[in-house]
Every structure is written in structure tokens, then in C-alpha cells.
Curated annotation (Swiss-Prot):
The gene is sat. It catalyses: sulfate + ATP + H(+) = adenosine 5'-phosphosulfate + diphosphate. GO terms for molecular function: ATP binding; sulfate adenylyltransferase (ATP) activity. CDD domains: ATPS. The keyword Nucleotide-binding applies. It comes from Microcystis aeruginosa (strain NIES-843 / IAM M-2473). It comes from the Bacteria. Its EC number is 2.7.7.4. This is Sulfate adenylyltransferase. One of its GO terms (biological process) is sulfate assimilation. Coiled coil: none annotated. The lineage of its organism: Bacteria, Bacillati, Cyanobacteriota, Cyanophyceae, Oscillatoriophycideae. Pfam families: ATP-sulfurylase, PUA_2. Belongs to the sulfate adenylyltransferase family. Pathway: Sulfur metabolism; hydrogen sulfide biosynthesis; sulfite from sulfate: step 1/3.
């Protein structure tokens, strides 16, 4: 099912809706005990939700082999539409063997709740090493995305899905805004141009600077932190959200910013994930997307601006969303303000950069990072979280 939308066209032209109606849900629930079951981990469950609400439009389900291979090799679906990350449901061979193509499969969450169904159109084996090198640019299993890839099952189950059950987010129900809702909100605010910002980290001054630079040239900012699965050493989502709320209350014009959660999981695929994140924000109704330094990167696997260069591999207008590329921002002691090398005449020793590692070290000690790096209220919130208070 597709739905009519406001504003910029979703990826592929139509916003997908795979949320079962009450009648459809009743039909599937009547079959609940008869259907073979597959249990979803946190990432697969978030993918199910994102497909169903249209965040992954034009996908209607988990990828069949032709789409999967085309995406891995060429960053396109088989119909030629740009798409950078494979969206698959991978299971062990012993789970896949008894499943028959053409049948419905019951999808359960980790607690055994019946959350969705998959119409199994195909099951296929895939090459993990090939996917790792093409998508993540490495087969090093120390890379968190590659690690997940090598730990998951060796058979992909493909086919359209229906979402049967989705509870309000247990921590952030008021920020659970789906693509149809965000588009309606943008329309009601009369925003014609909207820039999306992806983050898995608390907002620091450099982020604030580039967001406000972007806000100078568009109508609204869609602040869209990711709350799906992340690395164990990333700042927990509840802490990050409290930091975003502080920023919204004190440092942003509230009539020009919308804060919402992004339920999808991180892949840490760097450049390819930047494309993926841009397409997701396009589906939510954004016309522009901020791409900063090492977007969706981890460690030293990607170059500082590789996630910006990858947008140049597509023809102008082909992605349907405008990347706003920003250099690494810093605090300039000469000009007493945030800047980049494009706007500051400063020497390297006049630029204040703090690594995430250094900041975490300060926070664990209960020490506030310098105000040039973080707003004091945000730093205080992070200290409370790091010290368990």
C-alpha cells in the first residue's frame, strides 16, 4: 500500500505503508500458531519497522537476490534507483531449511511477540566477504558493521512484509514521528526546504555550528537522532535525547526545528551509509541533508570526507535530496567563535579540537569539557550519566 504525501516526492515516487489494517491483522493473528516462526534481533526488528512506515521507501520487504547483489555491487536497486545499503533478513541454515517459498512466515521479536509477517518469495545464500569489502570497504571483523555481518546467518530470507504490532517507543513516545507525520508537520509549518541531521552522538558545539549554518539557508531543521542499535560504547539513546532536549530549550529557535527519533540501526558503513541516511531523510520529507566529517564512520576505516565524495558518484538530482557538505568545525581562539578552515584565518594552534575519547575521559572524571567544545548544560548531563547519578 502507498499513501499520498506532502512536499518532496519519496524515494521511488511513493511513500510505502506496510502496516497491517485491523482486518489484515485479525487474519494473521488467527493463523499465529500455524505459521513457522523466525525471531528478529534488534536490527532486523528496526528494519521491519522502517520498511513498514515508509522510511525505507521504495522497499516493501527484505531484498531478493537480484536487488541485493545490485546494491552490493553498484549501489542501485535492479530498477536502477540509487540505494547504498542491503536490507536483508539473515538466518542460520537450519532455520531456513524447513521454510517454503510462497508461504507466510511469522516474525517474532526477541520476547516472542508476534510483530509481523513475511511472504517468503525467495531464500538465498550470499557472500559475506564480498558484501563486507563492497559495503564497508573492509573485511576486518574489528569493524562493528563487519562483525555483525559475519555473525549473522548465511541465508537471506526475502519478500514483502506486514507490520502487525508496534508499541509506542518506551522512552521517547512523543518523538516517535513517522514519515507521513513529519511531512504533514512540514506542510503545516509551510516549510518548503528542510535540512535533515543524522546523529548518534550528543550535540557538541561543532554540530550546533553546522546545523545553524544550514538553518540560515533553509526553512527548517529536522533533528533526527538515531535510537536503534549502536555500538556498546556509544552514548545511550536516553542520555543523548536529554542533551537534544536541552539544546532545543536553550539554544535553538523552537519554531524552526523539529526533534524526532530515527528508529533504524547503525551499520557504521561510512560513505555508503551517508547515502542511505540521506535517502531515509528524503522519505521523511527533507529536501537537504547535512554531511559532515567522517559521517557514519568508525575508527580509521574511512577518509575524513569520503562520505561527502560518494555523493559525486551520482548524477545531479538523481538522489532527489541535496547534500550540504561541511568541513570539520572547531573553536577559533583568534576570532573567538566557531569556524572551519573556509572561514577562519587561524593557525592550527589557534584551533580547539577535542576528540571523543578525550571528552569521555574528562566526563568520567567529572570534569566539564571547555565551553568551546560543549554547552555547559549538556556537559553536566553527560557527567551525570557517565557517573551513574
Amino acid at each position: 500500500m502507498t499513501v499520498l504525501t506532502e512536499g518532496i516526492a519519496p524515494h521511488g515516487g511513493q511513500l510505502i505503508n506496510r502496516i497491517a489494517t485491523a482486518a489484515e491483522k485479525a487474519e494473521f493473528l488467527a493463523l499465529a500458531e500455524k505459521l513457522p516462526r523466525v525471531s528478529l534481533d534488534e536490527r532486523a526488528l528496526s528494519d521491519l519497522v522502517m520498511i513498514a512506515i515508509g522510511g525505507f521507501s521504495p522497499l516493501k520487504g527484505f531484498m531478493e537476490q537480484d536487488d541485493y547483489e545490485k546494491v552490493v555491487d553498484d549501489m542501485r536497486l535492479i530498477n536502477g534507483l540509487p540505494w547504498a545499503i542491503p536490507v536483508t533478513l539473515s538466518v542460520r541454515e537450519e532455520v531456513a531449511d524447513p521454510l517454503k517459498e510462497g508461504n507466510w512466515i511469522r516474525l517474532d521479536d526477541s520476547e516472542g511477540n508476534f510483530v509481523g509477517v513475511l511472504e517468503l518469495t525467495q531464500k538465498y545464500r550470499y557472500n559475506k566477504a564480498h558484501e563486507a569489502v563492497n559495503v564497508y570497504r573492509t573485511d576486518d571483523q574489528k569493524h562493528p558493521g563487519v562483525k555483525v555481518l559475519y555473525e549473522q546467518g548465511e541465508i537471506n530470507l526475502a519478500g514483502p512484509i506486514w507490520l502487525l504490532q508496534r508499541d509506542p517507543h518506551p522512552q521517547f513516545p512523543k518523538y516517535q514521528i513517522d514519515p507521513l507525520q513529519s511531512r504533514k508537520m512540514f506542510h503545516e509549518k509551510a516549510w518548503k526546504t528542510i535540512v535533515g541531521f543524522q546523529t548518534r552522538n550528543p550535540i557538541h558545539r561543532a554540530h550546533e555550528y553546522i546545523q545553524k549554518c544550514a538553518l540560515e539557508v533553509v526553512d527548517g531543521l529536522f533533528l533526527h537522532p538515531l535510537v536503534g542499535a549502536t555500538k556498546s560504547d556509544d552514548v545511550p539513546a536516553d542520555v543523548r535525547m536529554r542533551c537534544y532536549e536541552i539544546m532545543m530549550d536553550k539554544y535553538f529557535p523552537q519554531d524552526r526545528v523539529i526533534l524526532a527519533i530515527n528508529p533504524s540501526a547503525m551499520r557504521y558503513a561510512g560513505p555508503r551509509e551517508a547515502i542511505f541516511h540521506a535517502i531515509i531523510r528524503k522519505n521523511y520529507g527533507c529536501t537537504h541533508f547535512i554531511v559532515g566529517r567522517d559521517h557514519a564512520g568508525v575508527g580509521d576505516y574511512y577518509g575524513t570526507y569520503d562520505a561527502q565524495y560518494i555523493f559525486d558518484e551520482f548524477e545531479p538530482g538523481e538522489l532527489g535530496i541535496v547534500p550540504m557538505k561541511f568541513e570539520h568545525a572547531f573553536y577559533c581562539t583568534r576570532t573567538s567563535g566557531m569556524a572551519t578552515t573556509k572561514t577562519s584565518p587561524s593557525l592550527p594552534e589557534e584551533r580547539i579540537h577535542l576528540s571523543g575519547t578525550k571528552v569521555r575521559e574528562l566526563l568520567r572524571k567529572g570534569e566539564l569539557p571547555p565551553p568551546e567544545f560543549s554547552r555547559p548544560e549538556v556537559a553536566a548531563e553527560l557527567i551525570r550519566a557517565m557517573q551513574g547519578s
